[in-house]
Structure formats: structure tokens, C-alpha cells
Curated annotation (Swiss-Prot):
Organism placement in taxonomy: Bacteria, Bacillati, Actinomycetota, Actinomycetes, Bifidobacteriales
GO MF annotations in UniProt: glutamate racemase activity
Pathway(s) it belongs to: Cell wall biogenesis; peptidoglycan biosynthesis
Keywords: Cell shape, Cell wall biogenesis/degradation, Isomerase, Peptidoglycan synthesis
Function (record text): Provides the (R)-glutamate required for cell wall biosynthesis.
Species for this entry: Bifidobacterium adolescentis (strain ATCC 15703 / DSM 20083 / NCTC 11814 / E194a)
Annotated binding of substrate, by residue: 11-12, 43-44, 75-76, 188-189
Listed EC numbers: 5.1.1.3
Protein name per UniProt: Glutamate racemase
Keyword Lyase: no
Enzymatic reactions: L-glutamate = D-glutamate
Transmembrane segments: none
Length: 258
């Protein structure tokens, strides 16, 4: 596989565009093929079997397009399908996971109180339970399923301040937020809500997502294989979606340009 081959990035819908943007920032010479499965969004309320089947169809298409690696820019699909995809395809498959370690390490040994905002399926899967087990003895962790946030992005309502804040309050008013050290955004859609979370949370609370760490890992893997794009290559992002409507195409481009 040539170093100039593209990187496949996919998500249940439009959230993974936040990861594609991170690749563009950190690895500007790379050619990214982005596929959003908005016709089947959200994944977070589906069964693991459904998510595995949908993910396999997408990765198979990427392989046919000659990608050198695939980034599962979806915490839910990572939880449900990453291991099976790695067993099936002979290319690097890079997944996401909630950046819980980053949040806990902020305390430098002091007990941290952390909310993990994610989809219901991400929080139900064994992968998250294993992650929780690593940290729950020394930290207080609150898993918070937030199914409605994916739909707001997919429906193009991200700029509707009242709708977004009303939805966030539904999930987070149960907490004394003044006691929270960090909120982990455990879904790539949620990264687009960072400014809203900043409005909701006290200044002392950190907002953490896994995009930066995932893209850093992608770079390390490609470098180890000698597959980083040459420095004179012109990077690009091609957007595709299972929902071929003009509305989704315009929304995807607006999120990429955001």
C-alpha cells in the first residue's frame, strides 16, 4: 500500500467529521475519505450485532477503495465492532474510546469526579465496563447516556441554543456540577457541543474528548509502517454519506468548515 493511499474515516453520521478535522490539523498531507452513515444514525440505540454489520459494510468499501488505514470515528462502533474488524481486515483499524484516563490523570493522584457523556450502547458495552474497572476504585465516575445529542447534530439544530441547552440540562441538572472535575465527551458528535458544555460547566471543570489521542495514535501507527503521506502531498477530505440528500451534504460541509 503506497504512503499516498487515503485514510478511511467513518462514523454513524456526522460526528466523525470532528475527527477528520483533527487529522487535517495534525496530518495536513493526508488524503481522507470520510463516510457518514446518517441514513442509519444513531448507532447508539442499536444492537451490537446491527452496528457490527453496518460497520463491516463500510470498512469493506474502504478496503475496495484502497485505504491504508481505517479510523472508526465513532465510540459506539469501536465498542461493538473494532475487534471483529481487526480480525477480518489486514490493515490498521484505529478506534475511539472515552478519554477517561486523561480525565483521571488530571488530578495527579487526587480523586477525580468525572462524568462520561456517551451513547447508551457505548456505556453498555463490555469495553467501557473494562475501562471503568481500571479507574473506579480511585475515582468517582458517572456514566451519563445522552441519546438525544446525536440527533440534534444530524437534524442540523446545532446552532439552536435553546434546544441544545434544554437538552443538556435534562441530562446534567441531576449533578452538582460545581463538584465535577471533568466531563469526558465519549461520542464524536459531542465534540461539536464543546462551547455549550463550557457554558453549562464551571470554569474549573475540564472538557475532554478522545479525538486528539486517536489521531496521534493514527500518526504513530502510520509512521511505524512507513505509510505517512510525503510532506509535499496535498491533503484533502472527501465527504460521502449513506444519506445522499442535499441537506446532509450541506450540513457535513458546514461541520467540516466549522
Amino acid at each position: 500500500m503506497a504512503s499516498t493511499a487515503p485514510i478511511g474515516v467513518f462514523d454513524s453520521g456526522l460526528g466523525g467529521i470532528s475527527v477528520a478535522r483533527e487529522i487535517r490539523r495534525d496530518m495536513p498531507n493526508e488524503h481522507v475519505l470520510y463516510f457518514g452513515d446518517s441514513a442509519n444514525a444513531p448507532y447508539g440505540t442499536k444492537s451490537p450485532e446491527q452496528v457490527r454489520e453496518l460497520s463491516d459494510v463500510i470498512v469493506k468499501r474502504f478496503v475496495e477503495q484502497g485505504v491504508k488505514a481505517v479510523v472508526i470515528a465513532c465510540n459506539t462502533a469501536t465498542s461493538a465492532a473494532a475487534n471483529e474488524l481487526r480480525d477480518t481486515y489486514d490493515i490498521p483499524i484505529i478506534g475511539m474510546e472515552p478519554a477517561l484516563k486523561v480525565a483521571c490523570d488530571r488530578g495527579h493522584g487526587k480523586r477525580q469526579r468525572v462524568i462520561v457523556a456517551a451513547t447508551p450502547l457505548t456505556l453498555r458495552e463490555r469495553k467501557f465496563a473494562v475501562l471503568m474497572d481500571r479507574f473506579k476504585a480511585d475515582h468517582t465516575i458517572f456514566p451519563e447516556p445522552c441519546p438525544g445529542l446525536v440527533e440534534i447534530v444530524e437534524h442540523g439544530q446545532l446552532d439552536d441554543h435553546d434546544v441544545v441547552m434544554r437538552t443538556l440540562h435534562q441530562y446534567f441538572d441531576q449533578y452538582d456540577l460545581s463538584t465535577i472535575d471533568s466531563v469526558v465527551l465519549g461520542c464524536t458528535h459531542f465534540v461539536f457541543y464543546r462551547d455549550y458544555f463550557r457554558e453549562l460547566l464551571p470554569d474549573t471543570a475540564a472538557i475532554i474528548d478522545g479525538n486528539e489521542g486517536t489521531v496521534r495514535h493514527l500518526g504513530v501507527v502510520l509512521e511505524s509502517l512507513g505509510k505517512l503521506a510525503p510532506e509535499d502531498a496535498e491533503g484533502s477530505i472527501d465527504l460521502a454519506n449513506s444519506d445522499t440528500s442535499a441537506r446532509i451534504a450541506q450540513l457535513a460541509q458546514s461541520l467540516l468548515d466549522r
